[in-house]
């Protein structure tokens, strides 16, 4: 089998560069910002992203989880609306709907979501 490094180079699995790139660097502190840190969390402390990741270790990975993780790594923020975390995929979908349907269409989609969410309770 072969691996593709971050710089695009294709190398064998037993290449020493593969082992060094797959191990996280020691002492690295994850980047924290206002968007991905919960209210009341210290600036260097674990935010909801790390807590959610720890809670989902046993959960099956979906394509949306993978896409969210890649978008967060690229710098798209996760923000909070009340006590709900809004993932980057959801933010991009909302922007796309806003462009395609306008404000009225976006409000209609929000109303349909709200009614369906409240009817499940």
UniProtKB/Swiss-Prot annotation:
Gene Ontology CC annotation, any one: membrane
Region listing for Disordered, in residue ranges: 12-58
Residue intervals passing through the bilayer: 92-112
Swiss-Prot/TrEMBL keywords: Membrane, Phosphoprotein, Transmembrane, Transmembrane helix
InterPro entries for the chain: DUF4605, FAM241_domain
Residues bearing the modification Phosphoserine: 33, 62
Location within or outside the cell: Membrane
Topology term for the membrane: Single-pass membrane protein
Main location: membrane
Compositional bias segments (type: Polar residues): 19-35
The keyword Acetylation is annotated on this UniProt entry: no
Low complexity biased stretches: 48-58
Function (record text): May play a role in lysosome homeostasis.
Family the entry assigns: Belongs to the FAM241 family.
Record-given protein name: Protein FAM241B
Gene it is expressed from: FAM241B
